Amino acid sequence: MRLTRRKARAVGIAAGIALLGLIGYWFRTQLTLAAFDLFFSGRVKAQLEQSYQPIVRPAPESGEASVRKEESPEEAAADADRPFTLLLLGIDSRGNERGRSDAVIVTVVRPRDAALLIVSIPRDTRVDIPGRDKPDKIAHAYAYGGAGLAVETVGKFLDLDIDHYASINFRGFREVIDAIGGIRLPIAKDLVNDDPGHEHFVVKAGQPFYNGEDALNYVRFREDAGGDASRAKRQQIFLRAILDKASEVGEWRKIPELIDIMGKNFATDIRPDEVLRLAERMLAGGSRAVYSHTLKGAGRMDGGAWYFFADERDAERVKAWIRAWLDADAKLRDLPKPDPAESA
């Protein structure tokens, strides 16, 4: 879906690194990027150092695991405009448990064009998870093996190499939403989650703003006719609602609080210097373009469990989009894009 100029100005890289993008927006509109560098970049970098968690990846030739080779700062700077893939994981965990990736979003970032392609994969999608003896839900990959296995699983499913990941605990979103005074959500009727096998809650319709708890329950709601696909679309609405509210609040004094929230709930294998450089690159341009799509398919029981079966034609279309978007020489105007009507 193509955003308006006002909305796109708030996006930055937030669809891929949501909390940093939200912070970056405020610096652009309230203090400018120069003031950001002067007053807050050191604090942000310190929190990013805390959040930097490279993952161990299998080395195909030796069969032994290894950490992805890091580029030197010079190599990274020279490669700053290269399109790359980012797997965004929204983690729903309670207490000290690892949790599952309730949001699985593949993003192609084109820094030179300040453009994003976002593909949401329903969490119950039936896939082959490396190391497991039978197919399972894509959300379970993170529970079994953390970000590394999630990256490997999604890459295998879409026949591509995932360059980077970013994971955000949903409790971090809740704290962000409360810090900015709630968000607007298009809830026309009460959402009642009361199935015996589900967490019980009610989200009242028609509220002017929804607090963090209600907003997360909006994302977690499971009992509508659209099932897992509807849930994935609500995740996109949820992210956009956070960014829309951020564009209105404009209170830069809240930024230190948001930086602290980011440090506690955010993890990525992108080095801190690269994150800051990418944020500045994406924020320094004019209007930005964000195109989104939710993988099509249907849900049904299989082997005693409920799965979402991806539509093969749509999955092939998504793979073709991603390959095209990763072509650094391609012009944005010539790239295939999702139909906005399909993402509404």
How should these model regions be labeled?
Residues R2-A344:
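Non-catalytic, solvent-exposed segments at the cell envelope interface
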